[in-house]
């Protein structure tokens, strides 16, 4: 089994499943940190170029993309969009 391959419930103990969730949680936090770093870089470029700090068109595109990705992975799009709304508001 590879690191990104989900564990089948019949093949894993509760502890193994919890360890897998812990690994996924760590990856999520790492991705949030990476996204925040890049968003901070975008903000710096906008500041240097005297551009507005918000770009509603770009935010709309991010939200649309989040919805499409949610559908692709069969995840509740409202949940995914809520997470992305928080990420956008934080940066």
PLM-predicted stretches and their roles:
Residues 1-91:
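Domain-level signature for soluble enzymes in the chorismate/prephenate branch of the shikimate pathway
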């Amino acid at each position: 089994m590879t690191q990104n391959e989900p564990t089948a419930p019949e093949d894993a103990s509760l502890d193994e499943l919890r360890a897998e969730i812990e690994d996924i949680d760590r990856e999520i936090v790492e991705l949030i940190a990476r996204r925040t770093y890049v968003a901070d870089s975008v903000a710096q470029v906008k500041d240097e170029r005297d551009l507005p700090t918000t770009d509603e068109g770009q935010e709309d595109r991010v939200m649309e993309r989040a919805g499409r990705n949610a559908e692709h992975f069969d995840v509740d799009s409202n949940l995914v969009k809520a997470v992305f709304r928080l990420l956008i508001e934080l940066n």
